[in-house]
């Protein structure tokens, strides 16, 4: 799906906007799915790629956030193996606090989703662990400050 912001008043752009306006053509109440799940690598690059998706959803369907329908699928950073049993850890700190209780285990650092075996990826898809994206109470003011027309508000915020 592609999100395009069009501010031009040309005839071609108006036609494009009418034909491709995602917001007008899709209502959150008529979506075929209960939730939107975003899955990326658990490293900084993967987490950084989430923001454009969030912005697209937020600027078109803020009600999905209010309803708790935007979620991150947590992906493991470390998989500890004891025999055939696996334990997944979603942060290094989580692993560090549990490692002493795991006897004779091996670990595997997951560099990205491509590091998962097919069975692990299937498990993650079939039994996802979610983080629900929650908005602060003043989200409308924050969004207006960060994305609105008043650059002075952003400059003031960034200088704090």
UniProtKB/Swiss-Prot annotation:
Top EC group: isomerase
GO cellular component: DNA topoisomerase type II (double strand cut, ATP-hydrolyzing) complex; protein-containing complex
Enzyme Commission no: 5.6.2.2
Cross-referenced Pfam families: TOPRIM_C
InterPro entries documented for this protein: DNA_Topoisomerase_II (IPR050634), Topo_IIA-like_dom_sf (IPR013760), Topo_IIA_B_C (IPR013759), TOPRIM_C (IPR031660)
A GO biological process held by the record: sister chromatid segregation
Keyword vocabulary terms for this entry: ATP-binding, DNA-binding, Isomerase, Nucleotide-binding, Topoisomerase
Catalytic activity: ATP-dependent breakage, passage and rejoining of double-stranded DNA
A GO MF term: ATP binding
TM stretches of this protein: none
CC cofactor: Mg(2+)
Functional summary from the UniProt entry: Small subunit of the DNA topoisomerase that untwists superhelical DNA. Controls topological states of double-stranded DNA by transient breakage and subsequent rejoining of DNA strands.
Additional remarks: There is a 50-nucleotide untranslated region in the coding sequence of gene 60. The ribosome apparently skips this region while reading the mRNA.
Quaternary state and interactors: Part of the DNA topoisomerase complex made of gp39, gp52 and gp60.
Protein name in UniProt: DNA topoisomerase small subunit
Taxonomic source organism: Enterobacteria phage T4
Taxonomic classification: Viruses, Duplodnaviria, Heunggongvirae, Uroviricota, Caudoviricetes
Gene: 60
């Amino acid at each position: 799906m592609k999100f395009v912001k069009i501010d031009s008043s040309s005839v071609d752009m108006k036609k494009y906007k009418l034909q491709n306006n995602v917001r007008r053509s899709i209502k959150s109440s008529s979506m075929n799915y209960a939730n939107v799940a975003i899955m990326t690598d658990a490293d900084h690059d993967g987490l950084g790629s989430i923001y454009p998706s969030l912005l697209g959803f937020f600027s078109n369907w803020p009600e999905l956030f209010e309803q708790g329908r935007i979620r991150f699928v947590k992906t493991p950073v470390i998989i500890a193996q004891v025999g055939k049993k696996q334990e997944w850890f979603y942060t290094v700190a989580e692993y560090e606090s549990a490692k002493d209780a795991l006897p004779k285990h091996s670990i595997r650092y997951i560099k990205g989703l491509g590091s998962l075996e097919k069975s692990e990826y299937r498990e993650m898809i079939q039994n996802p662990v979610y983080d629900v994206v929650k908005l602060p109470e003043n989200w409308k003011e924050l969004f207006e400050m960060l994305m609105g027309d008043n650059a002075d508000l952003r400059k003031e915020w960034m200088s704090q």
